[in-house]
Amino acid sequence: MRVTQGTFCYLPDLTDEQIRKQIQYAINQGWAVSVEYTDDPHPRNSYWEMWGLPLFDVKDPATIMFEVQECRKQFPNHYIKVLAFNSTKGIESTALSFIVNRPANEPGFVLRRIESNDRVQRYQIHSYATEKPEGSRY
């Protein structure tokens, strides 16, 4: 099952040239770009590990692409995404986020039905990948 998080998630994986162009777009908007990674693909896991520091004031997409490549070398079987943060007063939020690396095998999720008080049915999703300990999921 393909994890669909962020912009372009329903499109085929971006090439390095397409990634570079998106990074250039973010730089042109004045956004700070960063790289993050995780081995926990749960949709509510919004706190991924940060690769280095956010790349504030970087004007060359090659610098950020270098960081993406280094992160891919270190974590070839993790999800890696590029984030662009808009620090404009009143916005101060992620403006662009897309996955640039994913594991070769994405095991998917199981949907569990849980009966709660007064026979209320609740649903929970659980990633098959998280059944293994952190660092050995893929």
From Swiss-Prot:
HAMAP family: RuBisCO_S_bact. This is Ribulose bisphosphate carboxylase small subunit. In this alga, in contrast to plants, the small subunit is encoded in the chloroplast. InterPro entries: RuBisCO_ssu, RuBisCO_ssu_dom, RuBisCO_ssu_sf. RuBisCO catalyzes two reactions: the carboxylation of D-ribulose 1,5-bisphosphate, the primary event in carbon dioxide fixation, as well as the oxidative fragmentation of the pentose substrate in the photorespiration process. Both reactions occur simultaneously and in competition at the same active site. Although the small subunit is not catalytic it is essential for maximal activity. Heterohexadecamer of 8 large and 8 small subunits. CDD domains: RuBisCO_small (cd03527). GO terms for biological process: reductive pentose-phosphate cycle. Pfam families: RuBisCO_small (PF00101). Its main location: plastid. It comes from the Eukaryota. Belongs to the RuBisCO small chain family. It comes from Cyanidioschyzon merolae (strain NIES-3377 / 10D). It is found in: Plastid, Chloroplast. One of its GO terms (molecular function) is ribulose-bisphosphate carboxylase activity. PANTHER family: RIBULOSE BISPHOSPHATE CARBOXYLASE SMALL CHAIN 1, CHLOROPLASTIC, RIBULOSE BISPHOSPHATE CARBOXYLASE SMALL SUBUNIT. GO terms for cellular component: chloroplast. Keywords: Calvin cycle, Carbon dioxide fixation, Chloroplast, Photorespiration, Photosynthesis, Plastid.
